[in-house]
């Protein structure tokens, strides 16, 4: 999408911004410094190298302005924007997400595949381990379904593990979800989630990136994109994370940006719970049910309550008859244990069941 109000910026200025965006060692703050100093990207590109040096900008940035690679990349981006459902949001235009605009290093340009309007909707970020346990994945999916049903857009990084579970679960209940990439949109990573990303776009959600379309995976870009995940959101929920997890970076950034930080506790013997426990010690809200999140964010919009599972759920009926262990429920219901555990997690979130001393009971 060219800017919604096309009178705000000329085609020449748009191309100039895309060229500026591709220059090496030119991050968000330097990008805006150039626009402020010269008034527009077109004038910044034509300014003498000495003027760039006077602003403290590196020589490598100025020298690359007229390179073939920079020009070709900008032309390719213009062609990409001409296709359906492919958009560009700019930091100085009214369509840019208001919450994201508040952070110090908001990306000046944001490429969007899908529906850009959902970036303005109330969002809750969900992050966690790429190597999540099965219970961790089930917990992420259960919370995502409930939060999406309550009206939140679920925002995450489209990584393996918790991210993917959160995105997929939101789609399953007809919710919307945003994936923030650490690569360009044309260099999708991880490839295993390409189909998930396509489903998100097809179902009215979005995939976004601040990087040039052809930017390949680089280790340093993934922590950098985390500030966008937190910056778009009202709060960040960490589901399962070790003490060295990148999810803790997102949580730290969220706190610095004035966002809420939530963490789900786990077993003291589980290494992937130690990061969440550290966050709780540092002041994150300990979350056991969705109500712990909704209580703090209810004022942002008229949220509907999550749709509860019906009281006649087969597992609830079995538990009304007598308490059962998870394994006994699997045998009695004829369902796989993994499916039973996932259902029990959702039922517990809805307040219909409770686990005491290893046995599940139905709540009256």
Residue ranges and their predicted role:
Residues 2-13, 90-364:
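Glycine-biased, small-residue-rich flexible motifs in mid-sequence functional cores and linkers
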Residues 1-95, 326, 350-358, 362-364:
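Short, small/acidic-rich helices and loops at N termini and domain boundaries
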């Amino acid at each position: 999408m060219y800017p919604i109000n096309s009178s705000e910026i000329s085609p020449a200025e748009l191309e100039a911004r895309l060229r500026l965006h591709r220059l090496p060692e030119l991050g968000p703050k330097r990008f805006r410094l150039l626009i402020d100093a010269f008034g527009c990207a077109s004038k910044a590109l034509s300014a003498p190298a000495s003027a760039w040096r006077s602003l403290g900008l590196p020589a490598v940035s100025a020298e690359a302005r007229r390179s073939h690679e920079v020009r070709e990349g900008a032309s390719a981006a213009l062609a990409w924007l001409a296709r359906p459902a492919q958009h560009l949001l700019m930091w100085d235009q009214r369509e840019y997400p208001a919450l994201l605009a508040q952070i110090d290093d908001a990306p000046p340009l944001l490429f969007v595949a899908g529906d850009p309007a959902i970036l303005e909707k109330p969002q809750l970020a969900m992050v966690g381990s790429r190597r999540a346990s099965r219970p961790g994945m089930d917990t992420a999916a259960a919370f995502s379904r409930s939060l999406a049903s309550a009206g939140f857009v679920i925002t995450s990084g489209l990584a393996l593990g918790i991210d993917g579970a959160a995105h997929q679960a939101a789609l399953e209940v007809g919710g919307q979800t945003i994936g923030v990439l650490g690569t360009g949109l044309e260099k999708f990573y991880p490839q295993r989630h390409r189909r998930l990303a396509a489903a998100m776009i097809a179902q009215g959600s979005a995939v976004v990136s601040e990087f040039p379309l052809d930017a390949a995976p680089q280790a340093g870009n993934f922590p950098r994109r985390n500030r966008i995940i937190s910056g778009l959101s009202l709060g960040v929920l960490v589901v399962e994370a070790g003490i060295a997890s990148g999810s803790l970076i997102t949580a730290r950034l969220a706190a610095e940006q004035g966002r809420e930080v939530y963490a789900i506790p786990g077993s003291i013997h589980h290494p992937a719970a130690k990061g969440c426990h550290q966050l709780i010690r540092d002041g994150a809200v300990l979350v056991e049910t969705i109500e712990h999140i909704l209580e703090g964010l209810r004022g942002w919009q008229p949220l509907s309550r999550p749709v509860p599972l019906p009281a006649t759920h087969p597992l609830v009926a079995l538990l009304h008859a007598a308490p059962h262990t998870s394994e006994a429920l699997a045998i009695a219901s004829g369902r796989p244990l993994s499916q039973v555990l996932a259902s029990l997690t959702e039922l517990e979130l809805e307040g219909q069941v409770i686990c005491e001393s290893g046995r599940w009971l139905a709540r009256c």
